[in-house]
Amino acid sequence: MGTAHKLTSLTIFILLLLIGAGAQASPKEADTIDELLEMFDESSCMECHEEVHAQWSDSWHAKSVVSSLGGIHNFIEIGLKKEWETPLTKGQLLKCLDCHAPVINFASEKLAIEIGEMIVTAFKEKDSAASKAAKEQLARLNVGCLACHNIKATEVARGYNGPAEQGMIYGPRGDETDGAHETLKSDDLVQSAFCMQCHGIYKASDGETINCNTLSGSYQNSYIANGGSKTCQDCHLEKGHLFPGGHDIDTVRQGIGLEVEITPYQHLPGKLEGVKDEKLWVPSAVVTVFIDNKTGHRVPDG
């Protein structure tokens, strides 16, 4: 009986240690954007990855919030406020910003609501000083280096992987960095499932399923189901961290085959009103256009 009591006490002690360790490992929440970005400081990334940073700076990931102000504004003002009569909370805002600015996961409730209000101001009060000031702050929020290489790196199978380690850089190879930072190999980063966390069906923390776009659906149900094997990264990371898509003319040329057949002919106008000479041949043509979708999903899609 004494041994059983000791084992029970030891088990409880170990559980308390684990709970305590988990509590200590939980990252703090930021009360300002400055504090938030300091927690996930990416300024040193460009020192070693200058070319990658330059590519990313020209990508839509770099402006993922300010380029989507209209949609997020409508979610807050029309969806939450009018249709669902639901207050703006961090949990609700994350239904947009968990993808458009994953660092918001580490914002306090107060800061998250302030950011939501900034989005409304930036879109609603166009050309005003308040809108300009809000946009300047919102432009600092995006899908940056640590969004993919840390925050979302373990989310494909979080129940198995657990949350990303603070300060760890996850990459497809896990290369040594000569002490620049800790690196851990993650096979998830080269799988389509990684991209589909956001470019597909999103599962919110409250259980709501959100289908902002149908891209992953057509990829899985049409391309993969019919024997396709390429991943999102095979096409959209081919040029590096520009992540080109439908906005890039070279990517469009690669993804869409275009053939045009023109058959010229002549015809008589017949006895139509306004025809001066019904025996004068009229030059005409039949134009047939063939469009071939070479991508792994519907085009257009989003």
Please state what every model-predicted region is.
Residues G2-T3, Q24, L242-F243:
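Short intrinsically disordered, low-complexity coil segments enriched in acidic
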Residues Q24-L189, M196-N226:
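Sequence context of c-type cytochrome heme-c attachment sites
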Residues L18-Q24, V299:
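Intrinsically disordered low-complexity regions specifically enriched for long asparagine
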